[in-house]
Amino acid sequence: MSNDWIFGACAVPDARMRSAALARQEQLTKPPGALGRLEQLAVQVAAWQRTEHPAVQRVWIAVYAADHGVAAEGVSAFPQAVTGEMVRNFARGGAAIAVLARELGARLEVVNLGVVNDPGDLSRVRRAWIAPSTANICEQPAMTATQLRDALAAGAHSIAQAKSCDTQLFVGGEMGIGNTTAAAALGCALLSQFPQALAGAGTGLDAEGIAHKVTVITRALALHADASTPLERLRRLGGFEIAALVGAYIAAAQAGIPVLVDGFIATAAALVATRLNPGVREWLLFGHRSQERGHAALLRALDAEPLLQLDLRLGEASGAAVAIPLLRSACALHNGMATFAEAGVSDA
């Protein structure tokens, strides 16, 4: 299997349903625009779903776990063993995203792409093993071509499963010690930014730790300066879980499944996905603005205005999950409010 599928055409939102939804908003018992962005969200979901009655009840959340070779450079406040330990925590339902998924009634898929502290087979974890970790990006490319292909395909597999369940919204999350370093390096390469602009605290680095992370990213960028395409930059600087998110976003757009993007790492993956296949952008909505330093720059590059700003920096799809009730409220208002004619209320 090649990577050619990632360049395939994306679905197109329904312009007729967008117009119909806009027309309904104008007739609801409220001043025009009084519900602000909630009105825009309802219209957007209606166009995505090709329906006059948009809904965000069937939600698929996929969390991809993978380790990074660059962790050997000391770029995280936590040991690498945490990635595997968190996979167990996801499976047991103790992680933040597991709690949120239960609260939302969402399907939670956890995918183990390769961790150093391997928990083995777990009943609630899909094993899509590639390697114990990527290679150290300061020494060599993060992935081989085959590993990149497999990681992209792992994300696409999630979408195939989600589509079979008639999913109305896909949310991608990640877990991997060292992945803010990989995401920052990838963002720098794609946006021609200096590492100081994108490298942040990650799991809780102090100023000295962030300065060291900047040095590590600078070394990685110098080593891979000849990577000239988004796909090659992903292969050299990314991670298994970042590539899986890229594959999931592209496959979702091709399948016509809306995507709610999480924080810094998920947004780095979204940037790669849109560079590889520009049609993906129409299917992306951004859940929140992370506290991670580089997130704002990535959002600007995508012309994205996130729904929330709560100073989150956990990952796991947690910030996007917190935004889902806003989408549900937008749809409920759109579907349930009376029109002026129905309510016998005078229009302006």
Swiss-Prot record:
A biological-process GO annotation: cobalamin biosynthetic process
EC annotation from Swiss-Prot or TrEMBL: 2.4.2.21
Keywords tagged on the record: Cobalamin biosynthesis, Glycosyltransferase, Transferase
GO molecular function, one term: nicotinate-nucleotide-dimethylbenzimidazole phosphoribosyltransferase activity
InterPro entries named among the record's database cross-references: Nict_dMeBzImd_PRibTrfase (IPR003200), Nict_dMeBzImd_PRibTrfase_bact (IPR017846), Nict_dMeBzImd_PRibTrfase_N (IPR023195), Nict_dMeBzImd_PRibTrfase_sf (IPR036087)
Position of the signal peptide: none
Pathway per the UniProt entry: Nucleoside biosynthesis; alpha-ribazole biosynthesis; alpha-ribazole from 5,6-dimethylbenzimidazole: step 1/2
NCBIfam families: cobT_DBIPRT, PRK00105.1
Protein family (similarity comment): Belongs to the CobT family.
Protein name, entry field: Nicotinate-nucleotide--dimethylbenzimidazole phosphoribosyltransferase
Gene designation per UniProt: cobT
